[in-house]
Amino acid sequence: RGMLEKKPPLAFISGGKVYRKDDDATHLPMFHQVEGIYVDENVSFAQLKDLIYKIIYSLFGDGIELRFRPSYFPFTEPSAEVDILSKEGKWLEILGCGLVNPIVLENCNIDSNKYSGLAFGLGIERIAMLKHGVTDIREFYKSNLDFLSQFK
């Protein structure tokens, strides 16, 4: 909606619940996500990577190891998933990102020949998993007071 109401340059951050079919130790059927978008002239994937590094380093410190993997999201092109190396030595996906698909821009009456954008979605529960060494994301929703009391 924000892209329909404003003209570039524009930037938005929003948060909310996301629903999907996944349910395992690293995926929930409902999770909380912070999303961001930035649209202006000449926005590049290099700018997106720089922003992601700044976000991750601000959350976990400069010593955290991360990697970008090619991925697919219909609203970004190209798309990537970003993984962080956990304390246990396993890679854990923490966010999805990419350059805004030109079709999305055009559908918002933004000239995709003049403007481009970047977007990302960051899972809040994943941040908590990594910061606190939690191995099963479902623990956050089991009502186990012994587990939950450590997060006061």
Please describe what each predicted stretch is.
Residues R1-K152:
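TRNA-recognition modules of translation machinery and tRNA-sensing kinases, especially anticodon-binding
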